[in-house]
Amino acid sequence: MKIFVPATSANMGPGFDCLGTAVSMFLELDVLETSDKWFVEHDMSGISHDESNLIVKTALELAPKLTPHRLSVKSQIPLSRGLGSSSTAIVAGIELANQLANLNLSQQDKCKIAAKIEGHPDNVMPAILGGMVVASKIEDQYYFQELPLIPFDFLAYIPNYELDTKASRNALPEKLPFKNATHASSILGTLTASLALQDYGTAKRLIEADEFHEPYRQKLVPELVKIRKIAHQHEAFATYLSGAGSTVMTTIEHSRTEEFIASLRKAGLDDRIEQLKASSQGVFIEK
């Protein structure tokens, strides 16, 4: 059995901790033979191979008596780059327990469990449901709506340095003035409605008008301002900081992507670039 989980791009502009989309880059978990103890094969530096691995740890939270297996993980998703690497591991662990322990979890169950473990829903829900999702939590209940896929390329510029989520969060202010918070919320509300109506002309301006996190984090990711400037020259839809960074995501019409990449390289932006699409496919199984 193989479990596939898509990467996610969250915190889309003003959609801080609530708006994210699945993209066409995957973690693949191959469930192999039973064993005396859990062992996770992978080639990722700094990630454990035993039952403390986040995938296994998550599965055991749901089903403590699971029979140990040998697992093999292959992932296209770079670690600590704002593309949901920890969320994909959590979702893979939930699905592993769901399949091996026959838990028969609903999508709502999976979303609630994953968001509780991760701490916020904007990465895990698109990884489970696929597509673009906006979500919030009231008391102990999560509410979400699925939005139409953005029909452009997602061009991920992935700097050659990690940006720890905790460090990125520490760059944020503890409080926002009431006036600032209401203005930032109005931008998010209008953006969400524009995306739902596929009014990309309006959404284009709003997604780059974040006041929640990008103004405070852009000093940690200097590439954001540089790439956004070049993207404007190529009439891209929008450029934003993906997740907590360090990936900078640009959504752009496919016909403009090649020239945009060439301009990035010409400007000396030489790190990894991935040309992706929004993915309608959430976590899925091959047996």
Swiss-Prot record:
Pathway: Amino-acid biosynthesis; L-threonine biosynthesis; L-threonine from L-aspartate: step 4/5. Its main location: cytoplasm. ATP binds at P78, L79, S80, R81, G82, L83, G84, S85, S86, S87, T88. Belongs to the GHMP kinase family. Homoserine kinase subfamily. InterPro entries: GHMP_kinase_C_dom, GHMP_kinase_C_sf, GHMP_kinase_N_dom, GHMP_knse_ATP-bd_CS, Homoserine_kinase, Ribosomal_Su5_D2-typ_SF, Ribsml_uS5_D2-typ_fold_subgr. Its EC number is 2.7.1.39. Catalyzes the ATP-dependent phosphorylation of L-homoserine to L-homoserine phosphate. Keywords: Amino-acid biosynthesis, ATP-binding, Cytoplasm, Kinase, Nucleotide-binding, Threonine biosynthesis, Transferase. It catalyses: L-homoserine + ATP = O-phospho-L-homoserine + ADP + H(+). One of its GO terms (biological process) is threonine biosynthetic process. This is Homoserine kinase. It is found in: Cytoplasm. It comes from Lactobacillus gasseri (strain ATCC 33323 / DSM 20243 / BCRC 14619 / CIP 102991 / JCM 1131 / KCTC 3163 / NCIMB 11718 / NCTC 13722 / AM63). PANTHER family: HOMOSERINE KINASE, HOMOSERINE/4-DIPHOSPHOCYTIDYL-2-C-METHYL-D-ERYTHRITOL KINASE. The keyword Methyltransferase does not apply. It comes from the Bacteria. One of its GO terms (molecular function) is ATP binding. One of its GO terms (cellular component) is cytoplasm. The keyword Cytoplasm applies.
